[in-house]
């Protein structure tokens, strides 16, 4: 049975965003929220009837805010806004990101501060529930005033304009509506602005990256534990006593995760006079992975505030006051999403260094590049190069977008957040780091099969190894494979919901203690 998400403007969770964006969960509107939307709309209708001067209702936009618009032109004003603000560039956003954007916008409008008609909110919901996904170019937003360009592309199909995906096919907006059995609408006063003035695109993209980042942090612990198995890692750096005296939550959680994953392993060891300490990439897994866990926990908290917030301008209070402010400004999310990118980049960085330890015969005491008869065979040689390339690209992408600004709109909008760029960068860093971590898991399984003694694996590392071996064979000779196909298969296994779910049935994994 399809999950039904109840939207009230106040209680949307990150997990519910994923359910709608990726799994087709249907949504319904809360009755009290509907009443709030209707009450807010009545105030806008009164403003138009009384010919009051209110930004975006009876005036132009941006630096044209001092240009008065007659009541008879207020409808055309809103359509003009959408037609001219839909000026995005680049490839389309993924459909799951667009569905997240639609959902978050609906939830924000349900708080009843935007003056939009209930029927217009219901129309956007109809598109979402029936699987009509607007074509939104990925570039063109400054993250203030909100995400004007991409959100305008979201609105176009509601008017029978633009383009949209329906049942996997890209169609004109009108054709998508026709095939889904949806009637187009005409916008009323304030509605175009209510639909496009907000941080919804950057939040939608960043929300998906945050959720996926949480999964990646668990996968990175699995990868690190498998590398520990290969290197006969010393387990004392993961003892609880060490971490309770520095009670950083992510660090404590990581140490516990590694203990759980390695429980029962016959490959790990203890410190001896001959071998006192392991290198940082093994010994300091709790401190390195844990810092990223704490960062992403902070970002998730910010995301769940933002997806239940009003980021429109102007807003209309319950008492009927109109306030022009700056809730559309993306800075409160731009900085967290920059932080997210840095946290995910570090996971890729340390994983790549562990890949190097696996393929380096001087460090692993295994055949060079994890292949029998190196020389005739190159094995994982260039795989490590590829991981290094992704890790280095991540370092460039980790430069914060939020420290940049560029004035726009005749200097009326003179300091912007670049939050959408921050979110997009974080999503790209995530993809790169996820490939590196999947490669570490694949390489560690290859290394385990090359070890002269095949000891029992840990409670969590054993199912990880078995899941990889169900889809990928041990690589004996270069002539038997095209390694990019093997890498793609490894990524598909590791990124599948089954991989993490199976391991979490065996051991508890968490990102906070």
Which residue ranges define each predicted feature?
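FAD-binding glycine-rich core of flavoenzymes that anchor FAD
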Residues: 113-139
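Conserved, non-catalytic sequence blocks in retroelement Pol enzymes and Pol-derived host proteins
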Residues: 113, 142-144, 375
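A glycine-/small-polar-enriched, mobile loop at the entrance of the PLP active site in fold-type I
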Residues: 26-27, 86-89, 111
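C-terminal auxiliary extensions adjacent to catalytic cores
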Residues: 2-25, 29-36, 40-48, 70, ...
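Alpha/propeptide regions of enzymes that mature by internal proteolysis
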Residues: 92, 115-117, 218, 302
């Amino acid at each position: 049975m399809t999950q039904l998400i109840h939207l009230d403007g106040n209680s949307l969770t990150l997990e519910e965003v994923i359910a709608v964006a990726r799994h087709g969960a249907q949504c319904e509107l809360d009755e009290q929220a509907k009443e709030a939307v209707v009450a807010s709309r009545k105030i806008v209708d009164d403003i138009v009837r009384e010919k009051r001067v209110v930004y975006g209702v009876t005036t132009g936009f941006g630096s044209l805010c001092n240009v008065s618009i007659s009541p008879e032109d207020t409808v055309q004003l809103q359509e003009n806004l959408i037609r001219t603000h839909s000026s995005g560039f680049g490839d389309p956003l993924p459909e799951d990101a667009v569905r997240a954007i639609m959902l978050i916008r609906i939830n924000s409008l349900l708080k009843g501060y935007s003056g939009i008609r209930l029927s217009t909110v219901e129309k956007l919901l109809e598109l979402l529930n029936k699987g009509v996904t607007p074509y939104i170019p990925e570039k063109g937003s400054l993250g203030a005033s909100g995400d004007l360009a991409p959100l305008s592309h979201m609105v176009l199909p509601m008017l029978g304009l633009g383009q949209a995906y329906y049942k996997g096919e890209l169609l004109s907006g009108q054709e998508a509506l026709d095939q889904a059995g949806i009637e187009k609408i005409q916008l009323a006063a304030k509605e175009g602005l209510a639909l496009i003035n907000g941080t919804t695109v950057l939040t939608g993209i960043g929300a998906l990256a945050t959720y996926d980042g949480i999964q990646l942090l668990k996968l990175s612990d699995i990868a690190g534990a498998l590398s520990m198995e290969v290197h006969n890692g010393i387990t004392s750096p993961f003892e609880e006593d060490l971490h309770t005296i520095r009670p950083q939550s992510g660090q404590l959680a990581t140490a516990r995760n590694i203990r759980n994953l390695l429980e029962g392993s016959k490959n790990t060891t203890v410190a001896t006079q001959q071998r006192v300490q392991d290198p940082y990439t093994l010994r300091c897994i709790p401190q390195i992975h844990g810092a990223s866990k704490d960062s992403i926990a902070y970002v998730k908290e910010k995301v769940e505030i933002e997806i239940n917030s009003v980021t429109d301008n102007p807003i209309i209070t319950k008492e009927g006051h109109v306030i022009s402010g700056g809730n559309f400004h993306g800075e409160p999310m731009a900085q967290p999403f920059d932080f997210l990118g840095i946290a995910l980049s570090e996971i890729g960085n340390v994983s790549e260094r562990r890949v190097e330890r696996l393929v380096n015969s001087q460090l692993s005491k295994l055949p060079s590049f994890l292949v029998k008869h190196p020389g005739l065979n190159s094995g994982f040689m260039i795989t490590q190069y590829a991981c290094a390339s992704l890790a280095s690209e991540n370092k460039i992408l980790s430069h914060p977008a939020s420290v940049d600004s560029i004035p726009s709109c005749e200097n009326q909008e003179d300091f912007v957040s670049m939050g959408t760029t921050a979110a997009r960068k974080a999503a790209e860093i995530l993809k790169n780091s996820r490939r590196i971590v999947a490669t570490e898991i694949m390489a560690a399984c290859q290394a385990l099969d090359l070890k002269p003694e095949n000891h029992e694996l840990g409670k969590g590392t054993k199912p990880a190894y078995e899941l990889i071996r169900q889809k990928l064979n041990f690589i004996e000779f270069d002539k038997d494979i095209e390694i990019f196909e093997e890498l793609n298969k490894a990524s598909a296994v590791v990124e599948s919901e089954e991989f993490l779910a199976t391991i979490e049935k065996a051991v508890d994994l968490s990102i906070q203690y």
